[in-house]
């Protein structure tokens, strides 16, 4: 595999700003590893962060890389982020899904249109855009051509980037970590249904 992805899957009706918070925490973990991350909207309710891998990386190694990053985020920010697969156990937390890297799993590709009520497009972002604040509804089939003309193919650097150092993540995961806390979030009603992001 040439890249891996971390899928941020929020419960229904959670403000998208909270998804952006988790994306920033993923970026922090990647920065510790000197690994580049490329965010994009899913075109629906979630966000994907892609990380280039060395050419020929086995699926198992890519999956382990994402599992370590996702677990670090969930451990440091347990009030908002989780790697819990059970929807009932997640509550109002955002699922940091690394299992989409299992062979045969699929994600909406960059620039793909989605069948939803706002005609969303899965759109690559810069980190500056993410930091400034965006929503999935900002990127639709109606304004996609205009955006491409303005910013070009933001996904091109992913295809050219040097792959992440897989040895670095193994060392990082073994080192002692300081657990953080997330302020201002509370678990409320349990999400009752699953949805594709």
Regions found by a protein language model. Give the residues of each.
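C-terminal accessory nucleic-acid interaction domains of nucleic acid-metabolism proteins
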Residues: 1-5, 9-16, 25, 32-33, ...
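Nucleic-acid 5′ end/cap handling module spanning
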Residues: 17, 40, 53-55
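Active-site glycine- and acidic-residue-rich loops that bind
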Residues: 20
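Active-site palm subdomain of RNA-directed nucleic acid polymerases
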Residues: 27-41
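Short, conserved phosphate-binding/catalytic loop or strand-edge motifs used
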Residues: 41-51
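Catalytic palm subdomain of template-directed nucleic-acid polymerases
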Residues: 50-62
């Amino acid at each position: 595999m040439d890249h891996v992805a971390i899928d941020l899957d929020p419960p229904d009706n959670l403000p998208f700003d909270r998804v952006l918070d988790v994306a920033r925490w993923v970026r922090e973990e990647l920065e510790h590893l000197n690994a580049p991350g490329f965010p994009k909207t899913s075109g629906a309710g979630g966000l994907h962060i892609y990380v280039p891998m060395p050419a020929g990386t086995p699926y198992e190694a890519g999956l382990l890389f994402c599992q370590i990053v996702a677990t670090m985020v969930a451990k440091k920010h347990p009030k908002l982020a989780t790697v819990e697969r059970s929807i009932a156990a997640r509550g109002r937390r955002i699922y940091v899904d690394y299992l989409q890297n299992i062979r045969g799993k699929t994600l909406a590709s960059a620039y793909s249109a989605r069948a939803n009520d706002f005609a969303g497009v899965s759109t690559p972002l810069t980190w500056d855009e993410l930091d400034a604040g965006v929503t999935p509804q900002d990127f639709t089939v109606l304004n996609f051509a205009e955006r491409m003309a303005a910013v070009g193919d933001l996904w091109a650097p992913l295809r050219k980037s040097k792959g992440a150092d897989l040895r670095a993540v193994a060392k990082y995961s073994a080192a002692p970590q300081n657990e953080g806390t997330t302020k201002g979030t509370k678990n409320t009603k349990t999400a009752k249904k699953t949805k594709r992001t």
